[in-house]
Amino acid sequence: MKRTMLYLSLLAVSCSVSAAKYPVLTESSPEKAGFNVERLNQMDRWISQQVDVGYPSVNLLIIKDNQIVYRKAWGAAKKYDGSVLMEQPVKATTGTLYDLASNTKMYATNFALQKLMSEGKLHPDDRIAKYIPGFADSPNDTIKGKNTLRISDLLHHSGGFPADPQYPNKAVAGALYSQDKGQTLEMIKRTPLEYQPGSKHIYSDVDYMLLGFIVESVTGQPLDRYVEESIYRPLGLTHTVFNPLLKGFKPQQIAATELNGNTRDGVIHFPNIRTSTLWGQVHDEKAFYSMGGVSGHAGLFSNTGDIAVLMQTMLNGGGYGDVQLFNAETVKMFTTSSKEDATFGLGWRVNGNATMTPTFGTLASPQTYGHTGWTGTVTVIDPVNHMTIVMLSNKPHSPVADPQKNPNMFESGQLPIATYGWVVDQVYAALKQK
């Protein structure tokens, strides 16, 4: 009920010009912000070494006290054509767009929900069935709970859904198979719960697929149109989009991902599977095949400059410049740890205990929150140190280490940099050793 009381205290606001004036990002130097430049140079050399031994590319941006103090790119946005190394790779720049993977959950779906809740159009205790007609238990369900499932259950990843039903893969999904957005919603409704809602936290893409559909139900717009017109455009963001190739971007502006489509170097097969190098299309299978590239759980592309503004909006308490998206009470509600698991906020992952060290390192404050993405992305927002870090990369743009043993382990994923906390710790160490 604590979250409900917090919600009731929110003031309805609109994403329009507000009387509030929020900090905007400016450029500064690491020295002026209190960083040890030699420690940052050591980090630079370490990242370069990781790229030299096979990590595809990295973009890193650091904000301290409302100032961008570090921004750099390493490696190649595309260096493979299929399994063959290119003679002339496409170099990564600080403007390169990356497939955000599950960071979509935060910077599209959560931002939309935070705005809608701040406006009083949604409540965390609303039942899913209020917005998704036909969402209910069936007589044959072994585990019931859909009838009373709430938005907050999905945000907490405690709704009972399996982690990944693999809807586009008929051999795995069986009767839940779908490669059509409308049909996918029906398959989600039929997806059996695996545990009693509210009894534990199991991270699930299905939760955010449903939340994306709820945003569309409330706004009457496709998810991509709503966030692009009502969130990104007011903030002046021009490089944060779903389906970038359909919206004026060229492949050369985007980091490539998997070498041989979604086949994991030839060991995965299902109807319509892509087999050529993924370049400008979302990697995630459910987002691409089952949702047309636009889903609440994956599909968003962006660069570090745009993500910096979105992270600063969170740090500011819901606004940027003259634009207010939501208020500080909403930010607090979404980033407060669950009573059952201190690492889960409402969607946001929180640095609540040592299990989050691979994401946030060992030096970030316990109040730090953010998210990761399967393609090699991490965002870190630390309100105590007033610092944010975004690292974008294209980790799957390398061969699979052993397709037969583990088709989801890429060679690049075995490098230390694939554990984001290593990079995060080096940033904090540079700040703490002036």
Curated annotation (Swiss-Prot):
It is an enzyme of class 3 (hydrolase). Keywords: Carboxypeptidase, Cell inner membrane, Cell membrane, Hydrolase, Membrane, Protease, Transmembrane, Transmembrane helix. InterPro entries: Beta-lactam-related, Beta-lactam/transpept-like, Diverse_Enzym_Activities, Pept_S12_YfeW/YbbE-like. The chain crosses the membrane at residues 7-25. GO terms for molecular function: penicillin binding; serine-type D-Ala-D-Ala carboxypeptidase activity. It catalyses: Preferential cleavage: (Ac)2-L-Lys-D-Ala-|-D-Ala. Also transpeptidation of peptidyl-alanyl moieties that are N-acyl substituents of D-alanine. Its EC number is 3.4.16.4. It is a single-pass membrane protein. GO terms for biological process: proteolysis. It is found in: Cell inner membrane. Coiled coil: none annotated. NCBIfam families: PRK03642.1. Belongs to the peptidase S12 family. YfeW subfamily. Penicillin-binding protein. Has low DD-carboxypeptidase activity. This is Putative D-alanyl-D-alanine carboxypeptidase. The lineage of its organism: Bacteria, Pseudomonadati, Pseudomonadota, Gammaproteobacteria, Enterobacterales.
